[in-house]
Design a protein with these regions (language model features):
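Positively charged n-region of N-terminal signal peptides that target proteins for export
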Residues: 1-4
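Amphipathic/hydrophobic helical signal segments and adjacent flexible N-terminal regions
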Residues: 6-7, 21
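Bacterial N-terminal signal peptides
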Residues: 7-16
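Carbohydrate-interacting regions of secretory-pathway proteins
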Residues: 19-206
Length: 206
């Protein structure tokens, strides 16, 4: 069993680094082994994160709250690529610069974007232009680019935001300093979510 777990972890790590290596300019944000380069948003928060097979898992039981993970490094203009998986009705978020939330929601059964939100929405700001969610238990892929105050997002191969101007924080942000660099922030206080293959390419300042 220990050998199998070790093999799974090694394979997961190899896969995460291979993605970045095959994409010129991209670097891995998560090494597949530990949370080096990341920190808890709240030191006193319940640690709901674990790592298994190169996957970063946030497991939150009903009635509980986890804690958010934030990169130590801050960024300005960049393209970020990642994969995530959620159960039905689970709720999480991926924050650009720690202030602009790309909503993660297990809403596949609804068959359409929620009014003003839903999976892939810029939370509290702009709903996705198309319904691109996959069923619970399937890996979903995202490419998000932020340049200045403009955000472009492709979810599962469909462009759902194209140069959307977002000049304000969208809620639960680390701070309101939208004109300054900020970290990547994985929301962990709402629901169960899994991430893998997080990688980024920093872009020139606008």
């Amino acid at each position: 069993m220990k050998k199998l777990l070790l093999l799974t972890t090694v394979l997961g790590f190899a896969l995460s680094t291979a993605f970045a290596a095959d994409e010129p300019g991209f670097v891995s944000l998560f090494n597949g082994k530990d949370t080096d380069g990341w920190k808890s948003r709240r030191a006193d928060g319940h640690n709901s994160w674990s790592i298994e097979g190169g996957i970063l898992k946030n497991t939150v039981n009903k009635g509980e709250h986890g804690t958010d993970l934030v990169t130590n490094k801050k960024f300005w203009n960049f393209t970020v690529r990642y994969e995530y998986q959620v159960p039905d009705n689970s709720n999480s978020g991926f924050y650009l610069r720690g202030r602009h939330e790309l909503q993660i929601l297990g809403d596949y059964k609804s068959g359409k974007p929620s009014k003003g939100g839903g999976n892939g929405a810029i939370y509290n700001h702009t709903a996705p232009s198309d319904f691109a969610s996959k069923p619970a238990g399937e890996w979903q892929t995202v490419e998000a680019t932020i340049i200045g105050n403009k955000i472009t997002v492709t979810l599962n191969g469909k462009k759902i935001h194209d140069g959307v101007v977002c000049d304000k924080a969208t809620g639960s942000e680390i701070d309101g300093k939208v004109n300054e660099p900020g970290p990547i922030f994985l929301q962990g206080d709402h629901g169960t979510v899994w991430f893998r293959n997080l990688r980024m390419k920093e872009l020139p300042k606008d």
